[in-house]
């Protein structure tokens, strides 16, 4: 791999001796007044939080809208999603939501945000073809004590799926609605900061309980 790099590019083999982590490298190379741009939609909240708390100089962290930079970027995949038949997994979405809400109540949480696709696939029994070689659908979700919202890209679901999820107490909403809906949350919200992206995290305007997604247990 090192032989294929352009001149001036150095390969940093993470995990090797004397090779710093990305966070440590940035902390050691950014000076007062420097500006570090990042895409909050693909950068985890935990990475930016750790970078902010660990810095020793006064550099600025700036979330950049990459649509202004990558103007000819291909659209996200919009492959149709589908519900995984209960005979293959044994538990309905409603049953899983009841279990998650029990965990939320034990920890005094009013809401739970899930952004990791494997956790969403398990919780909502949803599958798709948006990720090559992986049965995942592009999605976000918010679960409250009374409601559940599944955020899917327009055109990836149909009326049959809407009705099926409605029977399990789930409302399908547009993919990008997650941001403003997050801002409306109140009380305490359960999030996995190592999974949620910084853009969604920045919209949280209430108390945060940091922890792994219950669906991981």
Language model regions located:
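A composition/biophysics-driven feature that prefers long, compositionally simple stretches
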Residues: 1-217
